[in-house]
């Protein structure tokens, strides 16, 4: 890239790139972070603990048709590297450009950290990341792997449902996730609202629906960890389709 583009074009190229690194399995990440210091480079060091059990995989994945039979038995961690892909999915508050918001791929700090080393196995193979010191990457917040664990049941449900799709002949024979609508907004975009302290914000999800005609349940929650406000937020009517939220 540096040999074929101007400095301005390199900057444009780098600004379009996002790298999500699981544990650091060789020294390529250190070289990249050193060579392109302005790159958004995430190294997730708190990745395990959310994956389903072998029994769950057998029942919900491997038992489902020809595709399921291709799913291998676990050697290390089930779906161990999948959070790198899930970081791109529009679920919950996830936004690849706001890495501190949290989502299925985890949650990361906004300050780069120096010299985050990769896996021990990489070091034992002769890789020496210290050759590129200092290099800087974004990494996990103090929430650690709990930032993925809080969503794990939803991740499992999603995988199980999609495996069922592969063995059903019609759409009606499979289950599909409900469509969440806030006000009249049915997109997967993040909704931003401005409000003053002491005012009330009304959130209405009453137009949400399930494409299969199943009944809906609601559970509004305040995700405190990524918030700048660390006090209590009342969500007393959080099981209703409508939430009135008093801004602290």
PLM region spans:
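N-terminal acidic, glycine/proline-rich low-complexity segments
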Residues: 1-202, 208-211, 215-230, 242-245
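Short beta-strand segments within Ig-like beta-sandwich modules, predominantly Fibronectin type-III
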Residues: 233-239
């Amino acid at each position: 890239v540096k040999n074929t583009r101007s400095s301005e074009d390199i900057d444009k190229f780098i600004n379009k790139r996002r790298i999500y690194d699981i544990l650091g399995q060789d020294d390529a990440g250190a070289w990249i972070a050193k060579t392109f210091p302005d790159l958004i480079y995430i190294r997730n060091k708190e990745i395990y603990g959310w994956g389903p059990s072998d029994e769950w995989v057998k029942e919900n994945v491997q038992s489902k048709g020809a595709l399921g039979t291709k799913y291998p038995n676990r050697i290390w961690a089930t779906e161990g590297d999948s959070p790198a892909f899930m970081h791109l999915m529009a679920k919950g508050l996830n936004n690849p450009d706001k890495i501190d918001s949290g989502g299925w791929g985890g949650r990361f700090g906004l300050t780069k950290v120096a010299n985050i080393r990769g896996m021990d196995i990489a070091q034992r193979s002769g890789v020496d990341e210290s050759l590129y010191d200092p290099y800087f990457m974004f990494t996990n917040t103090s929430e650690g792997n709990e930032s993925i664990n809080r969503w794990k049941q939803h991740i499992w449900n999603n995988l199980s449902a999609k495996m069922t799709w592969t063995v059903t002949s019609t759409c009606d024979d499979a289950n599909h996730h409900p469509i969440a609508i806030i006000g009249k907004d049915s997109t997967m975009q993040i909704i931003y609202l401005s409000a003053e302290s002491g005012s009330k914000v009304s959130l209405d999800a009453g137009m949400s629906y399930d494409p299969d005609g199943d009944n809906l349940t609601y559970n509004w929650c305040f995700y405190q960890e990524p918030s700048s406000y660390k006090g209590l937020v009342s969500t007393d009517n959080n099981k209703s389709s409508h939430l009135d939220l008093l801004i602290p």
